[in-house]
């Protein structure tokens, strides 16, 4: 199963594609989509969507996952992050790809073992879980962590269905 994870942001959106075969995970690709702060907001969102649509067309994921937005004291930043996240959700929906959504602490716990893990710990564990992955940057590492989290959750759900059936 091909899964794609996203770490949304208006300035930088990370993406990561993995293949899940039972409990085995392997790295397929990752990257970061960047937009220029000097550009008009609508143009930045359009460029983000165009890049996401191309990535989804290229890798044809069966499922997607996105990190939830954490609010902060800067309402403008939170709003822009929410807009970028909306574009990510729209791109997946237009491609008819189902999306799992995960709080950052759930992603950290799934990958590192503790919900309070630091960014560098997440990056280190992504490299362990996906040997050979050349990370395009911290946002791409986070996106891969989101994809790994979704793979674990899907595997758990399948196991539960087998037990119940």
Swiss-Prot record:
Any single GO CC term annotated in Swiss-Prot or TrEMBL for this entry: Holliday junction resolvase complex
Location(s) in or outside the cell: Cytoplasm
The entry's keywords: Cytoplasm, DNA damage, DNA recombination, DNA repair, DNA-binding, Endonuclease, Hydrolase, Magnesium, Metal-binding, Nuclease
A Gene Ontology biological process term: DNA recombination
Active site: 7, 67, 139
Domain of life: Bacteria
UniProt-listed Gene3D superfamilies: Ribonuclease H-like superfamily/Ribonuclease H
Binding site for Mg(2+) 2: 67
Molecular-function GO terms, alphabetical: crossover junction DNA endonuclease activity; DNA binding; magnesium ion binding
HAMAP family in the cross-refs: RuvC
Family according to the record: Belongs to the RuvC family.
Protein name: Crossover junction endodeoxyribonuclease RuvC
Native species: Rhizorhabdus wittichii (strain DSM 6014 / CCUG 31198 / JCM 15750 / NBRC 105917 / EY 4224 / RW1)
